[in-house]
Structure formats: structure tokens, C-alpha cells
Amino acid sequence: GQPNKGLAAMFVMMNAARIGVGMQSLGLTEVAYQNALAYAKDRLQSRSLTGVKTPNQPADSILVHPDVRKMLLTAKAYAEGGRALSLHCALLIDRELHHPDAEVRSESAEQVALLTPIVKAFITDNAWTATSSCLQVFGGHGFIREWGMEQYVRDARINMIYEGTNTIQSLDLLGRKVLGNQGASLKKFGAQIAELVAEAQDNEDMAEFLNPLTKLGQQMTQFTTEIGFKALQDADEVGAAAVDYLRVAGHLVFGYFWARMAFVALQKIAEGDRDPFYKAKLQTARFYFAKLF
């Protein structure tokens, strides 16, 4: 290659690797969830607080217990939200590389750049939470090698470190991808949220998703402006705020995709589609906005 161009070339590889690490963590979240769900259905222990659910069994499955359900739903919500974001990024990458319109290629590349640190850091942070919670479902023997759950937790932890620690991702997001272009890329993503709100706001059942999403979008704009002004006086303000900023940005992005999924599910249910897939999507979206967002 050309002299003094190596670092730029390396970051082409690094950005791809960062998305790959996010995908690895997404897979860990999903497999941990599937294993924990299967175990929770099979493991019998005590009785439901609201009354016996399986009188023909010596105990109810631990799936009846609210905290177990919360841990499983957390993993499910993070896995499915991460999958939606990842598929969106894959579509953007295809457009960046292959779309015949140069303007579309440029805009797609800009959005990929904005979302890459979120894919890497937010999904890997979530995977750490999800795999740890899913191990917890197994109780004490989830910590031994017999089930393999402890390896998922270990694998999830390294993903927060390599290919650029998640703190580095947060600095990249706030310092370069947001403040570096005066928030232009973030505003374009905000325009997508506004389009969804305009399309779905006539559906009263969407209020529980659109209202908090809109509020967080407004707060995100406020946070960005405040941090930008403070950074002009002290560059350490960026470093101090970056990790929390990425966390908020990640929830804004996940919230957008969960609202989109809820909108589709509501439409399908209204059309008479009885596929339990749509009911499950809607219930998970409600959990995400009520407990995680």
C-alpha cells in the first residue's frame, strides 16, 4: 500500500471486525436465551405465587416466577432488537457497496459509520447482561461446565474489550460520528424516527411506543447540544459523557426498531393474522419499552 495510508486501511478492516463482534454477541445472546428458556420450562421448583399451575406435577416450572420471566424477556428483547439493527446495517452496507446512485451510496456509508459503534458496544454490553441473566436461570449449576452457560458469559465479556473497547466505541460515536459533523448523521436517523411517528401516530395502540421514543429523541438532541457546548471549554467533557451517551443512543436506536416491529405486529393482528409470532413480538416490544427503554 501507499506510505502513511496504513492506519486508514486498517480502519476499513476494524469497522468490519467491530460489526462482526456485535454479531458474535448477538449469537451469544440468542443461544443463551434459547438454552435458558428450555431449562426454565423443564425445571420444577416451588409453586406460582398466583396459585398452582400444574397440579399433576410435584411443583410448577420455574418459568412461572416473575423474576425468571423478566430475565428471559430481557435476553429475548435484546436479541431481537439487535437482530433488527443488524439486518438494517446489512441492508445499508449492500446499498453502500452496490447501489447505482452515488448519493444513496454516500448516505448509506454515513449511516453505517454512525451505527457501527452502537452495533459493537451496545449489543456486546447487552450480551453481557443477557448471558449473565440466562446463567442465573440455571441456578448454581449454571456456573459449572456441564451446561456450557459459563462459557457464553466468558465469551460475551471479551467482546466488550477487543476490536476497540466499548469506551473507545463511545468516544468514536460522540466525538467523531456525532460532534465531528455537527450532529448531521444523528439528525438523519432522527428523520427516520419522525417518519415512523408520522406513519403510525393515527394508531392509538402505538402511543405506548411512540410517546417515549419521541421524548428520548428530543432528550438526545438536548444532550448532544449540551455536551457540544461543554466540550468547547473542556475536551474531557466528551470522555466523561461518552459511555452514557452511547447507552442512550443505543436505546434510541433499539426503540426505533422495536416500535417498527410493534407497528407491523399490530397491523397483522388487526388484519386477522393469528400467527403467535406477531403476538409475541408485540408483548416483547411492550416489555422493552416498560422495563428496559
Predicted regions and their residues:
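Internal glycine-rich alpha/beta core junctions
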Residues: 1-219
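C-terminal amphipathic alpha-helical interaction region
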Residues: 180, 195-293
